[in-house]
Design a protein with these regions (language model features):
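Conserved, structured core segments of small domains
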Residues: 1-105
Length: 105
């Protein structure tokens, strides 16, 4: 299942609180990337907000795994997890309708 994770620094968290945890946080993120679990990472125009796209069995399992991250353990981040489902694009629907017209009736 694809899961969008939105990580936000909690209000009042300073960079000096975050810096001691960055090396371990990045090491753990890189390990998730190498296993294919972490698919994409995006920085945003909002300071302190990062978007990560994961592939995981469920939102609940990913939430549990993310509690091991140093910034989460230190209570410096809050996270929102959104399970995503893929819907057929219009072009794909049109293609099916054109090649198999009776399937959409």
């Amino acid at each position: 299942m694809k899961i969008l994770a939105i990580f936000r620094a909690k209000i009042g968290v300073s960079m000096s609180q975050v810096l001691p945890h960055i090396a371990e946080e990045e090491r753990m993120a890189w390990a998730k990337y190498l296993t294919g679990e972490l698919r994409e990472t995006y920085l945003t125009s909002q300071p302190g907000v990062v978007l990560d796209m994961f592939e995981a069995p469920s939102v609940a399992e990913l939430q549990q795994e993310m509690l091991a991250l140093p910034l989460m353990r230190a209570g410096l981040l809050e996270a929102t997890y959104l399970g995503l489902t893929q819907k057929p694009r219009l072009a794909a629907v049109i293609r099916v309708a054109y090649t198999h017209p009776k399937t959409l009736v």
